[in-house]
């Protein structure tokens, strides 16, 4: 999981879900976990 300034490219990957937890925006990808990230 990487911290990214912009998660737009991560959320466009197949299998990506955008989730808000504790005020932070995460991208979770079960199909391809390489494309997981946190907006920060």
Curated annotation (Swiss-Prot):
GO BP terms: namely: translation
Q: Which GO terms fall under molecular function for this chain's record?
A: structural constituent of ribosome
Q: State the signal peptide span.
A: none
Mind telling me which GO cellular component terms the entry cites? ribonucleoprotein complex; ribosome
For this UniProt record, give its keywords in alphabetical order, as a comma-separated list: Ribonucleoprotein, Ribosomal protein
Sorted alphabetically, which InterPro entries does this protein's record hold?
Ribosomal_bL36, Ribosomal_bL36_sp, Ribosomal_L36_bact
* Origin: domain of life: Bacteria
Q: Which family does it belong to?
A: Belongs to the bacterial ribosomal protein bL36 family.
**Which NCBIfam families would you find in this protein's record?**
PRK00831.1, rpmJ_bact
Q: Which HAMAP family match?
A: Ribosomal_bL36
Q: What is this protein called?
A: Large ribosomal subunit protein bL36B
Task: Give the gene symbol.
Answer: rpmJ2
């Amino acid at each position: 999981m990487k911290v990214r300034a912009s998660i737009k490219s991560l959320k466009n990957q197949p299998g990506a879900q955008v989730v808000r937890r504790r005020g932070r925006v995460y991208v979770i990808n079960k199909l391809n976990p390489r494309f997981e990230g946190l907006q920060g």
